Amino acid sequence: MRQGPSFEYPIKLIYKKKYLPVIILDKSGPWKKIKDFDNNTGWIHTVLLSKKKTAINIKNNSVLYKKSTIFSKPIVKLETGRLVFIKKCKVEWCKINSGGYEGWIFKNVLWGKIN
């Protein structure tokens, strides 16, 4: 992440993990101004961004269900900070996979650009 939209600006932050979700705040040519989960903001070149939809679980022990209803079978509880890959979302639910598990989770326990 850089302080401005060009390679001439100083590096502000280096990400060491792939697929972290970010929210895009602005654009300037091939650069996007982003905000990450820790509220860091800065500029990143579009070639470094993935098209994969991801989010971070923000509630400890969030339940992953087999179907998009609380009456469905619980599969696993996810810890805070868990990276999840979003397959699709409905009004209140998202179908995700993470750590070999796949199921439905409430949308309001996820951080990232869900829709």
Residue ranges and their predicted role:
Residues 5-7, 11-17, 21-29, 35-77, ...:
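Boundary regions of SH3-family modules and the immediately adjacent low-complexity/disordered segments
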